[in-house]
Amino acid sequence: MTELKQLILIGPLLAFAHAASAQDAFKSEQVKSGSEIYARHCAACHGPRMADPEGAPDLRKFPRDQRERFLTSVSKGKNSMPPWGDLLKPDEIEALWAYVTTGGN
């Protein structure tokens, strides 16, 4: 089998495995907490369950390898996004990261 065929066949499996491992890396309570925080503070701009954001980045597409960038953006704000560091505790921002990383599941 050529490398291209192998990649076509194996690629979706690897993507699924990556998503599953990201979800396993976070405790379900942390993801649930992140979901609640997201609904309260983020959904108005980023859309319910991160879908159809109005003028804000689509967080479903946020690079999963840029955790520090996410934490800093939420804490200190960026562009038109206000800073949330005074309102949210670090563990709450981490819970948001868990929620975003698991794709809202």
Set out the residue ranges of the language-model regions:
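Intrinsically disordered, low-complexity segments enriched in small/polar residues
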Residues: L14-F16, E36, E68, W97
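Short cysteine clusters
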Residues: C42-C45
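Gly/Gly-Pro-rich "capping" loops immediately C-terminal to redox-active cysteine motifs
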Residues: S28-E36, G47-K78
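Generic anion/oxyanion-binding catalytic loop in active/binding sites
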Residues: G11, Q23, G34, L59, ...
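Residues immediately within or flanking Cys/His clusters that coordinate Zn2+
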Residues: A39
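Axial heme c-ligation environment in periplasmic c-type cytochrome domains
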Residues: P53-R60, S75-N105
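Post-cleavage N-terminal segment of exported redox proteins
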Residues: M1-Q30, S73, L87, Y99-N105
